[in-house]
Structure formats: C-alpha cells, structure tokens
Amino acid sequence: GSVRRGIGSAVVRQLLAWPLPAARTELMPTHAQLRAIIAADPLRMRCLAHVRALALPDCWVAAGFVRSAVWDHLHRRGRSALPADIDVIWFDRARCDAAVDAEIEARLRRADASLEWSVKNQARMHLHNGDRPYRTAADAMCHWPETATAIGVRLSEEGEIEVAAPLGLDDLFALIVRPTAAFRGRKRQVYLDRLAAKRWSETWPDLRIVQG
C-alpha cells in the first residue's frame, strides 16, 4: 500500500540528529530514509505532534514540508527551514465546508502561533482543481503538480512516522522534478508556470527539472 510505518520515532531520535549525514542514510530504503530525515528534525516532529492532536481522519502533513526536508538533506544542508505554509491535508466528505478548515487552522495557530498553517479537506478540493471527486487524501495527492510533492507524513498514536507516497519516493530522492500525469497533459501550462514561480533550482541547484 501507499502507507508505510516506521520504527518508533522516539527510538529514531535517539539514534539520529539533524543535520543527518547523507552517508548514514544512503543505503536505507527510501521510506526508511524519509522517516529518518523527518525524525531527526525537532521542528518538523513538533508540527506532526500538533497535527496528530487534532485526530482528523486520513490526515497528513505534505508537500513542501516533506519535499524541502529531503532536498536540503541531499544538498548536505545543515538545517531545513519549514516552508512558508505547512500544508495539512485530510479527507472527510461529511465536513467539506471551507469554514471547517479555517477553524482547524485557528486551532493549530492556538497550539503554535509561530507557524503558518494551511489546512485543506481534500474531499472538496477536486472542485477547485477541476478534477473528478477524490477518494482519499492519497488519491488527491496523485492530482498535485509534481511527483516529488505528492508525499505526506504523519505520526501514529504509537509515535511512529507513517508515509503516504501514492506516486512513490524515487523522484524525490533522485532530485527529479517531474509533472504528474494530469500536469503532463491539459494542465501542463500550470506546471510550467509553477516552475517559473517557484525557482527551485536557485535554492537546490542539483535538481533535475523535467519540463513536462
């Protein structure tokens, strides 16, 4: 399946600390590498704990939260700053009103006002994106622009880091920016405009950009 569990994050934190030397992870399977990178970052672990406390269904912290951590690690950076917005996704067809997302964002700000939170119930986002209704949060991620963006993590009740990677982790760890299927076709220009706006290569020069 697309959800993988790792060893307990408390154990990982005893073994690893940020910055995490790439040589210590390069022989691990990619799911284990990702869990180790996230577990070694105290700020990201704090974010995951805040989100777990909400007890939302099918809920993940995704996109740049994961992507930039891995890219920074592979660029041998000493630390990985959080993205401007921390993308929290969840899936519940019974609570599709945008006001519910706004209230969840307010709860997260009360928990940690130093962070910028963005909460989106993926059960309604197909309307915004012009797609068929999504079935799960992972299904929604398959309709995001890049394969390396379509990845989420969360903390289980047991403190394990779980990974949702419906399109796999290969591109993320190969430093490849590649459009997903929809963004190779009718949404290709959206992908190209996003590349121009993000200017990722300026921050991560080892990236290989696929133009679509």
What are these regions (language model features)?
Residues 2-11:
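Extreme N-terminal basic, low-complexity initiation segments
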Residues 15-212:
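Catalytic cores of the polymerase beta-like nucleotidyltransferase superfamily
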